[in-house]
Amino acid sequence: MSCKKGARQRLYVSLWLFYILVFAAATEMDFYSSECHSHTYEIVLNSFSSIWLLINLFLLLCSFAIFLKYWCYKTFASETVKGY
């Protein structure tokens, strides 16, 4: 019984989240109108999600740079030592 109850609760939560997402997206009716084009839609950079995206992008680029610095140094050092 508990498995069915847990599955039913997960289904209700999923349906609730779907309902919230659909009606939250439906409030932005100007986005779906025929006058709105992707190249004219205004990007908002002061929302939480855009700030979070920029922070994640910065961290990703920093980690990529650190990895490349380590990898290039490791390759350079092994190639240099190989000649001796």
UniProtKB/Swiss-Prot annotation:
Membrane topology qualifier: Single-pass type I membrane protein
GO CC list: host cell Golgi apparatus; host cell membrane; membrane; viral envelope; virion membrane
Residue ranges annotated as Virion surface topological domain: 27-45
Protein name: Envelope glycoprotein N
InterPro entries: Herpes_glycoprotein_N_domain, HSV_GN
Signal peptide (from-to): 1-26
Residues on Intravirion side: 67-84
Oligomeric form and interacting partners: Interacts (via N-terminus) with gM (via N-terminus). The gM-gN heterodimer forms the gCII complex.
Membrane spanning residue stretches: 46-66
Gene it is expressed from: gN
Protein localization: Virion membrane; Host membrane; Host Golgi apparatus, Host trans-Golgi network
Family: Belongs to the herpesviridae glycoprotein N family.
Job description of the protein: Envelope glycoprotein necessary for proper maturation of gM and modulation of its membrane fusion activity. Also plays a critical role in virion morphogenesis.
Chief localization: virion
Annotated keywords: Disulfide bond, Host Golgi apparatus, Host membrane, Membrane, Signal, Transmembrane, Transmembrane helix, Viral envelope protein, Virion
